[in-house]
UniProtKB/Swiss-Prot annotation:
Pfam families: Cyt-b5
InterPro entries: Cyt_B5-like_heme/steroid-bd, Cyt_B5-like_heme/steroid_sf, Cytochrome_b5_domain
Record's protein name: Cytochrome b5 domain-containing protein 1
SUPFAM superfamilies given in the database record: Cytochrome b5-like heme/steroid binding domain
Keyword Iron on entry: yes
Gene responsible for this protein: Cyb5d1
Any GO BP: regulation of cilium beat frequency
Length: 228
């Protein structure tokens, strides 16, 4: 039986978000739960860490858990930056933090296995979504329960994605009509496309605290039987 009753929209039980904020990535900073971001995408490297558990080559990766490592990469080639090795005169990967998993040693070695296929940073195996280029705060007010929550969301996210973020606070969020300024919101569009402007830069220009005016979305309950 569908959990969402008569409400139109995506299957939220199997919903995949497209965007993650930098603060969300930063939460995944443990050995058993390690994410990083680079070149606009977010990657879950936990399986890689598990595979090479105990290997010293993991150290540079563990040191940047939950961080953006775009500076490791050449944005043109999307490969790890390279330089001329002063010892060999050969082109090598530049790894100032030390060599890490799938980076070849500076000199030929018989104990280095290169049969791993595609290096972890080149494929999409670990990719979980995009990094939000810009974030903003939004207030969501449940008019039925008179509860208010402030969420940080990505500016590129659709209302469905924002609703998915809100589910921990209200499991029946899809059973509500979402409104702003008296108008129903198009759940397939972003906040900006729905006319909810991000005025943070204007507040900064005026030396005013933008938190004093965080847009509020009002939720009105629909009796769609999902509470049964």
């Amino acid at each position: 039986m569908p959990r969402r009753g008569l409400v139109a929209g995506p299957d939220l039980d199997n919903f995949q978000r497209r965007y993650f904020t930098p603060s969300e990535v930063a939460e995944h900073n443990q050995l058993e739960d390690l994410w990083v971001s680079y070149l606009g995408f977010v990657y879950n490297l936990t399986p890689l860490v598990e595979e090479f558990k105990g290997d010293l080559l993991l150290k540079p990766i563990l040191e940047v858990a939950g961080q953006d490592i775009s500076h490791w990469f050449d944005p043109q080639t999307r490969d790890i930056r390279k330089h001329i090795d002063p010892l060999t005169g050969c082109m090598r990967y530049r790894t100032p933090r030390g060599r890490f998993v799938h980076i070849p040693p500076p000199l030929p070695r018989s104990d280095w296995a290169n049969d791993f296929g595609v290096p972890w940073w080149k494929g999409a195996n670990y990719q979980v979504g995009r990094l939000s280029a810009r974030t903003r705060n939004i207030r969501i007010i449940n008019t039925l329960a008179t509860q208010e929550h402030t969420l940080q969301v990505g500016a590129q996210e659709s209302m469905w994605e924002i609703l998915h973020r809100y589910l921990p606070y209200n499991a029946h969020a899809a059973s509500y009509t979402w409104k702003y300024d008296g108008k129903n919101l198009n759940m397939d569009q972003t906040l900006e496309e729905n006319g909810i402007r991000d005025e943070e830069e204007e507040f900064d220009y005026l030396n005013m605290d933008g938190k004093l005016h965080t847009p509020a979305i009002l939720l009105y309950f629909n009796d769609d039987l999902t509470e049964l």
